[in-house]
Design a protein with these regions (language model features):
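Short, C-terminally biased terminal segments at protein or domain edges
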Residues: 1-119
C-alpha cells in the first residue's frame, strides 16, 4: 500500500470523485464532453495531486501539492454550480455535496499546514 492511500483526505476525495461522476452523468449528451469533461478533470485532479504530493521528498513540495489539490476542489465545486445554473443538476444535488467539499478543503488545509510546520 502507498502512503497516500492511508490518508483520510485521500479516501474521502475518492468517495467524492464517485459522487461527482454520478452527477455529471445526468448532463445532456453534448455537455458530457464539455462541462462534464472539465468537472471530471478537476475532481480527479484532487486525488491525483494528493497522491503525487505524497511522493515528493520535500515538505515544501508536499504543501504545494495540497494547494493544487485544494484549487482543483474549488474549481470542481464552481463547475457543479455552473451545471446547476444551466439546469443540468438541481441545487439540492449540489448542496448535498457541499459538506464533503468543505470537509475535504479543511483536511487539505490542515495537511498543508502540517507540512509547512516542518519547513
Amino acid at each position: 500500500m502507498f502512503s497516500f492511500e492511508n490518508l483520510g483526505v485521500y479516501q474521502k476525495a475518492r468517495i467524492l470523485v464517485r459522487e461527482v461522476y454520478k452527477l455529471q452523468n445526468k448532463f445532456p449528451t453534448e455537455e458530457r464532453y464539455a462541462l462534464g469533461g472539465q468537472i471530471r478533470r478537476s475532481i480527479t485532479s484532487v486525488t491525483s495531486n494528493i497522491a503525487e504530493g505524497s511522493g515528493r521528498d520535500s515538505n515544501k513540495d508536499k504543501a504545494h501539492f495540497c494547494v493544487i489539490a485544494f484549487e482543483s476542489l474549488m474549481e470542481a465545486f464552481s463547475q457543479l454550480q455552473n451545471a446547476q445554473d444551466l439546469g443540468y443538476i438541481s441545487i439540492n444535488e449540489v448542496e448535498n455535496l457541499r459538506p464533503q467539499f468543505e470537509e475535504i478543503s479543511k483536511m487539505l488545509s490542515g495537511l498543508k499546514s502540517s507540512f509547512e510546520k516542518k519547513l
